[in-house]
Regions:
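Conserved alpha/beta-hydrolase
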Residues: 61-83
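Short beta-strand/loop motif that positions the catalytic acidic residue
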Residues: 310, 316-318
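N-terminal cap/lid segment of alpha/beta-hydrolase-fold proteins
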Residues: 1-44, 356-357
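Conserved loop-alpha-helix segment in the C-terminal half of the alpha/beta-hydrolase fold
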Residues: 318-342
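Alpha/beta-hydrolase
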Residues: 188-305
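Conserved alpha/beta-hydrolase "acid-adjacent" motif
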Residues: 58, 167, 299, 322-329
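Catalytic histidine-centered segment of alpha/beta-hydrolase-like enzymes
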Residues: 349-361
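Primarily recognizes the serine-hydrolase "nucleophile elbow" in alpha/beta-hydrolase
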Residues: 108-180
């Protein structure tokens, strides 16, 4: 296969100091890597994109191109830094990528929603079909228009997280008793203290889950109160940063009988306790507005809810040894997709298909065959 082609796409400006780069502020752009098939190809192009991860070297790009499907790994303006990430603005970036591919002459464009990109792809298509996200969660206008969001022809979701807001609600450490102190702990809810034998009792898990939601709701109430205070104070900034400590504490990491699949004990990122206490982790660095858009109960980017509002064909690739998506996750997607959804089980597949070249091949084969059936 030839090398990937670097793609730079102009996008609309975002909020003040969205990037510390003056060059980016003067000319906002996003970047991607396009892998094209040799020869004529199928006339179909795919975009694989995540709200913040760098997907320019995604493992599906070359296999899809080898099967006649051009594939662009596209980064949002927030690549590598989700501190100020607004999901509604990411839609503009993804829409710019779709428009760019259409302008290159591709007859059909599909989205590959991998990992956290699944909720993004679903959010995008739901808004492309019927624009409702006219305002951010905090109430300011998004300035999105239908012209920003050309619809795509199909969605392919793999190792699909249900959305940032759901994920954080299931991963927040409920033992935190002081939001300013990363070490302050209520041992009764410390998953990693070793106080409870595995498998965990059902009532223990229920109390843990309730405490997670209670912490999320406390943070959310503080965010709203702080935002209202700023907006009521002359000369105050429009937003502020804050930290959320310990965001990697799900009983399923330690008890594989919960929502059982083929996963090993632990986190997809290594030792779960280490990730929980790490200086940088999911949802650690935030602003008031970015928290509401990404992580809050009011986020507009809930994957299954958005998927239910779409009409295009959907392929769900379920990795059975994934330590971050579970049978209950797949059930949410299946219910949302209904009869439009086809599920392909990738037996033994871990979240990233790391070290599993045969399963990458299986996934690309399944995607090619499914697209040949549903796109006419």
């Amino acid at each position: 296969m030839p090398d990937a082609r670097l793609v730079a796409i102009d996008v609309q400006p975002g909020v003040t100091m969205e990037s510390q780069s003056g060059l980016q502020a003067l000319r906002p752009r996003i970047f991607g890597a396009l892998m094209q098939p040799q020869g004529e190809g199928t006339g179909t192009a795919a975009i694989v994109m995540h709200p913040t991860s760098n997907f320019m070297g995604h493992y599906l790009m070359e296999p899809l191109a080898a099967r006649g499907i051009a594939c662009m790994g596209l980064n949002s303006r927030y690549a590598g830094n989700d501190t100020m990430l607004l999901m509604e603005t990411v839609l503009q970036d993804l829409g710019a990528g779709v428009k760019w591919l259409r302008a290159q002459g591709y007859k059909r464009v599909v989205l590959v929603g991998n990992s956290g990109g699944a909720a993004l792809a679903s959010f995008y298509q739901s808004q492309a079909e019927q624009l409702t996200a006219t305002h951010f969660v905090d109430g300011l206008p998004t300035h999105l228009s239908a012209a920003d969001l050309p619809p795509v022809d199909a969605l392919m979701l793999s190792a699909a997280h249900p959305g940032r807001s759901r994920l954080l609600a299931e991963w927040l450490d409920p033992s935190v008793i002081d939001e300013t102190d990363p070490l302050a702990t209520d041992p009764a809810f410390d998953l990693y203290a070793g106080n409870d034998p595995v498998p965990f009792a059902a009532d223990r898990v229920a109390r843990f889950r309730a405490a997670q939601l209670a912490r999320r709701d406390r943070i959310e109430a503080w965010v709203w109160a702080r935002l209202r205070m700023l907006r009521a104070t002359p000369g105050a900034p429009s937003d502020q940063t804050f930290l959320v400590y310990r965001t990697h504490s799900d009983p399923r990491f330690l008890d594989t009988t919960l929502d059982a699949n083929d996963r090993p004990v632990g986190s997809i990122w290594g030792d779960a306790r280490t990730v929980n206490y790490a200086a940088n982790a999911m949802g650690r660095f935030n602003t008031l507005r970015s928290w509401l858009s990404q992580w809050s109960s009011g986020s507009q980017a809930d994957g299954p809810a958005c998927l239910a509002r779409t009409s295009v064909p959907v392929l769900l690739m379920t990795h059975t040894a994934d330590g971050s998506t579970f049978p209950s996750t797949a059930a949410l997607w299946r219910e949302a997709g209904g009869a439009r959804l086809t599920e392909e089980r990738v037996i033994g597949g871990n979240h990233y298909l790391a070290g599993q070249a045969a399963l990458v091949t299986q996934s690309a084969d399944a995607m090619q065959a499914w697209l040949a059936r549903v796109l006419h």
